[in-house]
Amino acid sequence: MNINIGLSDVLLISPMIALFLASLLPITMKVLRGNREQHALITLGQALMGIVAAVVLLVVFGGSDKTAFNNGLIFDGVTQWMGIIALAGAGAAMVMMYENPSTTGKQFSELIFLAMSSAVGMLILVSAVDLLMVFIGLEMMSLALYLMIAMSHEEKLSKEAALKYFILGSFASAIFLYGVAFIFGSTGGTNILSFMDNAAELVQTSRLFLFGVTFVILGFCFKVSIAPFHAWTPDVYQGAPTPHTAFMATAVKTVSFAAFLRIIATKSLTGSDQLFDILQWMAVITMIVGNAAAIMQNNFKRMIAYSSVAHSGYLMVGLITAGVSDNGAFGASGVIFYLLAYGLMTIGAFAIAAMLEKSENHIVNIDDLAGFAKQRPMLALCLTVFLLSLAGIPPTLGFFGKFYMFNAAIGEGLLWLAIWGMLNSVIGVYYYLRPIVVMYMKEGNAEIAGHSLNATTVTAVVMALAIVLMGFVSGPIFSAVEKSLL
């Protein structure tokens, strides 16, 4: 197969090139300085410059529906929106890494290099329409992430989290590749665009193709924490340094759902009632399991981890809607809008958690928030905004995210699925209100860590303001997302 690479291909992948070049700056400077770290703020600045450049290039070249590298990558509305959301989440997480005791030190340049390399993999994953390119992006993102988690100084929990994530991630990748092999055997190719128009028919006529699609979907179910493939999530989220957890919960989750969306958008669900029903029940079970487990947690990070599982269930409602809708843009835009809201509120929640960690091994329990409202009223208000938005309370952005997604499901006749989503959202209110009650109603001496946390504080405040202000203009934002997908 001949692949002709022209100037247009290079321009389309320029966001990835910008990220890659920016990732080299910190480690190059370290080598030139005789293996001595430059000031961490300079390293962070170099990374953020690369992210800003990549976002600008995505705005300029993304959304054009052009393909590159023999139709292996596409730069459409999904690529543009999901890429920007993921890069914004990655950038915010890097700001948290700059001030966190478990991630700063003699290896900060290497850590930023790995984070930027993972971000390059994210952009490949979010734009890939060839299953082999999806795999390349997935592995580039994941392998860098495994090393990032394991690099957390000498904390044993991080080493354990990295090992669990690596073993289970490798298993999921094997399942995904197994599915790709089946699809290649039944269609003679691995490009999603080549079988998108007749995927529903292939599911009915080719058992091999059905198996392939099923295995690919199962591989993604692990990556996005769909029950029963969610068990790794609380352990890894709790064991990883908090900035890394924020990185995984926002940027990694966003691009994984983007790739998952491209598979579901082939309309293969309409060709198999069994696969359609199984995914619906998996979405419901994921919501129930995530919320039920979150209620029983006292560890703040573990509670957010289980709530992340529940949110994956909500997002599955949007994916399924996009998979059966004649106007896939409506369901897909609901997923993108929800991921935008989810990214803001999750980064914010983990930013507050990071500020409460007094040391590398400190565990933040919900009861530790007692008195936080008196000690730090502004940060307590920010955390309240994040938790209310996660619960879906109006007029926060989280409420409108659920509204648009469930409304799309009802419009496609998936009323029962939307009802399950709304019921579980009500259940979630209980454990999201618990930290708020502890902060404002209980006496205590909750205080943030002694080291400088100015950048993390700014991150939390900006996220809280964005959640509130964007909630008032959610309609135009949703319309802009939907228009870019048409």
Curated annotation (Swiss-Prot):
Belongs to the complex I subunit 2 family. It comes from Bdellovibrio bacteriovorus (strain ATCC 15356 / DSM 50701 / NCIMB 9529 / HD100). The keyword Calcium does not apply. The gene is nuoN. Keywords: Cell inner membrane, Cell membrane, Membrane, NAD, Quinone, Translocase, Transmembrane, Transmembrane helix, Transport, Ubiquinone. It is a multi-pass membrane protein. GO terms for molecular function: NADH dehydrogenase (ubiquinone) activity; NADH:ubiquinone reductase (non-electrogenic) activity; quinone binding. The keyword NAD applies. This is NADH-quinone oxidoreductase subunit N. It is an enzyme of class 7 (translocase).
